[in-house]
Amino acid sequence: DLWMPIPPSSYLAINGAEILFNLSASNELIAKSDYREQLVLQQSARAIAAYIYSSSGVFESTSDVVFGGDCLIAENGSLLNRSKRFQRENNIIYADIDLLNLKNDRLVNKSFADLYDDSISQLKVQTVSFDFKEINKLNNKKIVLDRTINPCPFIPINPETINKRCAEIFNIQVAGLAKRLEHTGIKNVIIGVSGGLDSTLALLVCHKTLELLNLPKENISLSLCLVLVLPIKHMTML
């Protein structure tokens, strides 16, 4: 699947599959493991799906190739779990997959929806219906999630990566504002400054944009915004 120009799992994803399983027989070569991981991550991101990959174990062949039993679980470009290779015992890996998040990402991705046309919809795909709720009833156990959700998903842990991410955000805003000013022919900007982080960032973006367009900084006008918050003891609705 992963080694083909157009992976068959792509067609399954377009037809609605959200979890893709790949039972593979990928032999081990120097540096192939890292490349295999990148293929799994890329396909899960391209298909906006969860991709579960399981390769043959060390006892698979007596020929001149070696298998490592590599197992990976990825979700939309992120690696959720991976096994140790070259294990001589059976091992199981598992991960919590956010299906609702995958559904939402597919809904907002216009390119993904555009791929679904009559030719793809007519492909022979075997569909097996089941209900997760019914499976939970059979299990008779309370499901405890092992996945930890990052409360700050847009803030990298690495300080160097944080600086790079912030610079990218800043440059995107500058480029967007510069394009708008050039398109409209406007050479002056007015900013409502409240003293908070948002207005401070807006001021910095305007300063950099005027510098980029070779316009004088005096073209920035500031408007002081005051917000008065009073305690409400009684409220009357008309």
Q: What residues fall within each predicted segment?
A:
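Short acidic (Asp/Glu) and glycine-rich catalytic loops that position anionic groups and cofactors
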Residues: 20-23, 150-155, 185-186, 219
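ATP-dependent adenylation/nucleotidyltransferase module used to activate substrates
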Residues: 1, 161-238
